[in-house]
Swiss-Prot record:
A motif (DEAD box) lies at residues 200-203. It catalyses: ATP + H2O = ADP + phosphate + H(+). The gene is dbp4. ATP-dependent RNA helicase required for ribosome biogenesis. Involved in the release of U14 snoRNA in pre-ribosomal complexes. Required for pre-rRNA cleavage at site A2. Residues 1-28, 494-542, 560-579, 586-618, 653-776 are annotated as: Disordered. This is ATP-dependent RNA helicase dbp4. Residues 522-542, 586-595, 656-690, 741-755 have a biased composition (Basic and acidic residues).
């Protein structure tokens, strides 16, 4: 008899009970955490992470990473972010803004019990790859005890590998370009359930360089989300904030009332350096600071490469590195790692390393080229003096850049002092650079590209109060780079563009109307330039010269009408008509109607026509388009329902207009109606466009899913072995074929040709089944075969 059903006993009972208790305890802790967050006082003062209502995994991750004390931006921003509010965070460089948005990301997803099947929960955008890698490493440290899946999506890596894993990610740290590529191309990647959007260095991401990309990314995201914006120079433009659909954002600026926008322990200086002496002073500075860690910022990648290669050949006695956007991702990451770990080193870099990167113990920040604005200056000098450490920064300014740049820095509350360089400390490397460029053509070519890129970077700057290209000594600067002469630059010319544009018009007005032949020739030349005709082989044949020896000499001896010029005549002499018996007086075209008229009358009429009718007038009469400007404008009539004609734009009667009310009221009413109509039409158009994009994306993703499903089905096809269930009932097959004794007929078959043999054998095979009709026939056949 079977035992009665009852509660499980034994070794399996205790683990099940412990799992139930653990799940119940987790639910109680989660509800308690949610209640603590709701009761959080936003006006309170928080000094450590333990004062905040954080979950156990986040608190353990912060403690393991040795984060205990809160900075100003962290204490104010984290509390608002935990409440689910949108934030505009602004703080000085090196003040801990990364933790200010990573902690709320982990906490908000933890309280919502986010899992893998819930999809993407948080998206963190960074302007550069290096900053994205740094954010991802911090996220891995503090989130090590969470169960979320986090991913890093940047350019320079395999797109297919990212596509395979992207659908399982809960948190993504990415750059805008690669993120948009996945949103457009990856079929299994959806963002409809996104909870948080974070923009680090928000002013740079919302700048014109990323504007179209960021707008496209935001178009894929849901509007119901929490948005966090952080930067050292935060944007307050209404247009930028409207693009992000922020809902009552909290502006957290902890250093807005501070005396300076840069760290207090940062010593800032500037040096007036003429453009041709910049490399000499930079070389002298590096030689005198061999036991320090220095970052040198330049305006373009080609300048970085040239300065790095030339200084590397000169061997200053300190390790040199260079970083720019044209390098491959593996090399860039290796350079960032090596520079972070080194104690004494010089890094030449573009603005790719100007924002957000945390290099430990940087002593000097040198800005060899003037930054484009004060915000860029603040971010550059922020690579040193981080987390209350000391640091020094030096800005190299040309005399033409001093006044404008100092005015911009003063507006941003940047304290900076002027210093002078001792003349006996300077070392000139001009001759050495010339020698290297003479010996190495590649270095010379790189120097030319560096010169052009620098001039172009100055030319495209918007602030012309700072960047005055015409006041720069470009020839001397080219010589200081070791070049034999200044390279030609296409966009720099002596005349202004407007003057060049208006020059042909001014020249055309000066021409008199009597010079019809000159104008006609000029028009013909311009037409030839504008519309090049196709030249056939016959045209080329008749345009050939020197077809015989006397061709050029003979052309000098004849006039245009074919008559000969006297040998002893001057240059302006007429043809010698006495040499020929008959001479041509006048030529007529074939089929001319005026052949019967007298010659004198024709000559007089031709002269009169030439005086009265001009070439331009003839062309004007032949062109309908040119005659339209002398005609009046046409009128268009519109008929009402009763059949009465009205003008297309008919003015209303004054009495009817006054009867409808005051003019200002009518104007306000009309503007309100039109604004409402355009607003509704705009909303409808946007919704239609969005729906079309979504349908197109869904069709593409469905197609990709079908292709993936077909590929998986093809891969999973397996050939099963034959069913062996009925083989036991059957007789076992013989292991060997029975021996057959060939008769004389078989011998005859072997002797016959192959084509007869095959036909005969096929005939036998066809007739054999018909002869076997009874069991006796089968036995006789078997005995015959067995012999």
């Amino acid at each position: 008899m079977a035992p009665a059903a009852g509660p499980r006993t034994g070794k399996h009972a205790k683990p099940q009970r412990s799992k139930t208790l653990k799940r119940k305890r987790g639910q109680e802790e989660l509800s308690s955490l949610i209640q603590r967050v709701e009761d959080l006082d936003l006006k309170g003062i928080f000094k450590s992470f333990s004062d905040l209502p954080l979950s156990e995994p986040t608190a353990s991750g912060l403690a393991s990473s040795h984060y205990k004390t809160l900075t100003d931006i962290q204490s104010r921003a984290i509390s608002h972010a935990l409440k689910g509010r949108d934030i505009l965070g602004a703080a000085k460089t090196g003040s801990g803004k990364t933790l200010a948005f990573l902690v709320p990301v982990l906490e908000n997803l933890y309280r919502k019990q986010w899992a893998e099947h819930d999809g993407l929960g948080a998206l963190i955008l960074s302007p550069t790859r290096e900053l994205a890698i740094q954010i991802f490493e911090v996220l891995r440290k503090i989130g090590r005890y969470h169960t979320f899946s986090a991913g890093l999506v940047i350019g320079g890596k395999s797109l297919k590998e990212e596509q395979e894993r992207l659908g399982r990610m809960n948190i993504l740290v990415c750059t805008p370009g690669r993120m948009l590529q996945h949103l457009d191309q990856t079929a299994l990647f959806d963002t409809y359930n996104l909870q948080m959007l974070v923009l680090d260095e928000a002013d740079r991401i919302l700048d014109l360089g990323f504007q179209q990309t960021v707008d496209a990314i935001i178009g894929h995201l849901p509007k119901e989300r929490q948005t966090l914006l952080f930067s050292a120079t935060q944007t307050k433009k209404v247009s930028d904030l409207a693009r992000l659909s922020l809902q009552d954002p909290e502006y957290v600026a902890v250093h807005e009332t501070a005396s300076s926008a840069t760290p207090s322990k940062l010593q800032q200086h500037y040096v007036i350096t003429p453009l041709p002496q910049k490399l000499d002073i930079l070389w002298s500075f590096i030689r005198s600071n061999l036991k320090s860690k220095t970052m040198v910022f330049l305006s373009s990648g080609k300048q970085v490469r040239f300065v790095y290669e030339s200084f590397r050949h000169l061997q200053p006695g300190i390790p040199l590195m260079h970083l720019h956007g044209r390098q491959k991702q593996g090399g860039r990451l290796d350079i960032v790692t090596r520079f972070s770990q080194s104690k004494h080193c010089v890094l030449f870099s573009t603005d790719v390393a100007a924002r957000g990167l945390d290099f430990p113990a940087v002593d000097w920040v040198i800005q060899l080229d003037c930054p484009e604005d004060a915000d860029t200056y603040i971010h550059r000098v922020g690579r040193t003096a981080r987390y209350e450490r000391e640091g020094r920064a030096v800005l190299f300014l040309d005399p033409s850049e001093e006044e404008g740049m100092l005015k911009r820095l003063e507006q941003k509350k940047v304290p900076i002092e002027k210093i002078n360089i001792k003349a006996n400390k300077q070392q000139s490397i001009k001759d050495q650079l010339q020698n290297m460029c003479f010996k190495d053509p590649e270095l010379k070519y790189l120097g030319q590209k560096a010169f052009i890129s620098y001039v172009k970077s100055v030319y495209i700057q918007k602030d012309k109060e700072i960047f005055k290209l015409k006041e720069l000594k470009l020839d001397e600067f080219a010589a200081s780079l070791g070049l034999p002469g200044a390279p030609r630059i296409k966009f720099i010319k002596g005349d202004d563009t407007k003057q060049r544009k208006n020059a042909p018009r001014a020249a055309a007005h000066l021409l008199s109307d009597d010079d019809d032949t000159d104008e006609e020739d000029g028009e013909k030349k311009s037409k030839k330039k504008e519309e090049p005709q196709v030249r056939t082989k016959y045209d080329r044949m008749f345009e050939r010269r020197n077809q015989d020896v006397l061709a050029e000499h003979y052309s000098k001896l004849i006039n245009d009408d074919g008559t000969m010029v006297a040998p002893n005549a001057g240059a302006g002499a007429d043809a010698d008509e006495d040499d020929d018996f008959l001479s041509v007086k006048r030529r007529f075209d074939a089929g001319d109607k005026d052949l019967g008229s007298s010659g004198d009358e024709d000559d007089e009429s031709e002269k009169g026509n030439k005086k009265n009718v001009k070439v331009r007038r003839e062309k004007l009469l032949k062109s309908k388009k040119k005659l339209l400007k002398f005609k009046g404008k046409g009128t268009k009539l519109v008929y009402d329902d009763e059949g009465n004609p009205h003008e297309l734009y008919e003015l209303e009667d004054e009495e009817q207009f006054k009867a409808r009310g005051d003019a200002k009221d009518q104007q306000a009413k009309f503007l309100a109606e039109e604004a409402e109509r355009t607003r509704l039409a705009d909303m409808e158009d946007k919704e239609i466009a969005k729906q079309k994009r979504r349908e197109k994306k869904e069709k593409r993703k469905a197609r990709e899913r079908e292709l993936l499903a077909e590929a998986e089905e093809e891969e999973t096809l397996v050939q099963l072995p034959p069913y062996e269930g009925d083989q036991d009932d059957e007789a076992p097959r013989p292991s060997k074929k029975p021996k057959v004794k060939f008769t004389e007929a078989n011998d005859r078959e072997e002797a016959e040709p192959w084509y007869k043999k095959s036909k005969k054998s096929s005939d036998q095979a066809a007739h054999t089944p018909r002869q076997i009709q009874t069991l006796e026939d089968l036995e006789s056949l078997a005995t015959g075969l067995l012999g």
